């Protein structure tokens, strides 16, 4: 029997440890914290009543903190939030009327101050307990940040709105609207921009007054117009540079092709040179010899023609004379260049066959 009881207690303790380790006993911990808070408040109220109703030597109040033996949790779960005043009043109403607690209405103003002081002391006691080591500081900080953030957000938003409102008022309007210009205003602004791309304050004021606009609107229009002009010029420059790059690429490709062809010709015909015929000429010494031999040939031809007999020679004598003259003149004829040498036809003398003489009559 004792063995069964001991086993049952061990099982109960093990189950409790398992529940606490998994963080499933938060509701029981909240209930225990509420009970401890109620007991501490009751003790404080009893002590305050005894101090008010007692004699000259009141008994000192002893604060009792009854802490259950709770093993350390395996997981760092956040502590339960401290019970609020509404939950405490609801718990007291469910438990019933407490005869030891004095009515709050009879205390008056002093009772209300004492109750607030007791609530502060109870909150301090709860925050100083070991189970609530973290206390209500994370929640307070979170709520404080939340409230502060909510309070600061409207303030910050109000500051931003006030700044934007001030800037809008400086611009002359409560809300910013896109500037709509008429055709006449646009044309006049374009002409002014062609004359002056930038305006000084006097020109800006005069132009705004003439067009019935604000100076800020004129300044913004000129800024946008300069930006558009710069963008268009950048696009034009980009297109021009792109065309130049394409032209240079084509030229480079053509030069690379020609270079490859020249290298191929150099490797195939290393000793072959294409030279025109006009580059071939005679050396200076040959030219002098040719120029000196030409007058001598002409004088010898004239001498031979004058020395010939007037009698009509026979056919054999004429052929011999012509052949001898041709033989004498042939060595003296020299071309002026190698091109003439190869281009002129060469005449070869034909041998004259001997004619048979007729038989003589006796």
UniProtKB/Swiss-Prot annotation:
Predominant location: nucleus
Biased composition (Basic and acidic residues): 27-45
GO CC, alphabetical: nucleus
Record-linked Pfam families: HALZ (PF02183), Homeodomain (PF00046)
SMART domains registered for this protein in UniProt: HALZ, HOX
Region entry Leucine-zipper, spans: 232-276
Protein name per its UniProtKB record: Homeobox-leucine zipper protein HOX11
Functional note: Probable transcription factor.
Region described as Disordered: spans on this chain: 27-179, 301-330
Gly residues bias locations: 145-160
Keywords recorded for this protein, A-Z: DNA-binding, Homeobox, Nucleus, Transcription, Transcription regulation
